UniProtKB/Swiss-Prot annotation:
GO terms for cellular component: plasma membrane. PROSITE patterns: LGT. Its EC number is 2.5.1.145. InterPro entries: Lgt. The gene is lgt. This is Phosphatidylglycerol--prolipoprotein diacylglyceryl transferase. The chain crosses the membrane at residues 18-38, 51-71, 89-109, 116-136, 177-197, 205-225, 235-255.
Length: 277
């Protein structure tokens, strides 16, 4: 590569003709960390841990499929003439919002089958979701994707980024904004805020809705910086969906407080979640 800058090898392990890419390793690591955190949260809320494992078994494949369907829908101009590419997910092309939609629908159906509260289940997994997203963005980093507009090395150095990040943002002869990093850091901050909020008196379901609002707010602005956005006419799909989710989540919070009066929850000094009224 020109300018003496070499990108990181996206392949973690090479066994003969089989390549294990860092993207897959990072995503798998994110799932494992998310599961361990969700199991810890379930224990605090006195929920059967097997419920979390069972949910994950269903949610992972459904989320992958829904993430792919979401992407294909908004890139239909390409896929309508290349139908065989639809199933070739290893060529790239999944969307986090599609995965979240699939995960939420799975959780809703799962909670009804198991006869448990969807909102309680959603609160348990909310911290896991946002930290998994924070970790997962580093898979995009290794693939040199999900970046922003062209910039200069001087600008990136002005952000006091380590050289390995700056060098990885050198793509096809130009430097680009590390929007993957902006979103990852936004999600880490959101994770910390969720951990703080859960130690306050909060109503059931509002930890999850708070996660949706926080993530969507950050995604709206970061999406505006990206160069690979899925488009719906002249609009960036993720920005439109972010606004809708923010409004919907706030509306649900208001409606549930006024009409349903859900119970309060908070952590005690030992880290256990106790119910308040």
């Amino acid at each position: 590569m020109g300018n003496g800058v070499q990108p990181l090898d996206p392949v973690a392990i090479q066994i003969g003709s089989i390549s294990v890419k860092w993207y897959g390793v990072i995503i798998a690591s994110a799932v494992v960390i998310a599961l361990l955190l969700a199991l810890s949260e379930a224990n605090k809320r006195k929920m059967d841990k097997e419920i979390i494992v069972d949910l994950l078994i269903w949610a992972i494949p459904i989320s992958i499929i829904s993430a792919r369907i979401y992407y294909v829908i908004f890139e239909w101009d390409f896929y309508k003439n290349n139908l065989g590419e639809i199933v070739k997910i290893w060529h790239g092309g999944i969307a986090i919002y599609g995965a979240l939609i699939g995960a939420v629908l799975t959780a809703i159906i799962f909670s009804r089958i198991k006869k448990i509260s969807f909102w309680q289940l959603a609160d348990v997994v909310a911290p896991s979701l946002i930290i998994a997203q924070a970790i997962g963005r580093w898979g995009n980093f290794m693939n040199q994707e999900a970046h922003g507009a062209e910039t200069t090395r001087a600008f990136l150095e002005g952000l006091h980024l380590p050289d390995f990040i700056i060098n990885q943002m050198y793509i096809d002869g130009a430097y680009y904004q590390p929007t993957f990093l902006y979103e990852s850091l936004w999600n880490v901050l959101g994770f910390i805020i969720l951990l703080i909020i859960r130690r306050t008196k909060i109503r059931r379901g509002e930890l999850f809705l708070g996660y949706v609002i926080w993530y969507s707010f950050g995604r709206f602005f970061i999406e505006g910086m990206r160069t690979d956005s899925l488009m719906w006419g002249d609009f960036r799909v993720s920005q439109v969906l972010s606004l809708l989710l923010i409004v919907l989540s706030i509306g649900i919070i208001i409606y549930r407080r006024v009409k349903m009066n859900p119970p309060y929850y908070m952590e005690d000094k030992f880290g256990k979640v106790v119910k308040k009224k």
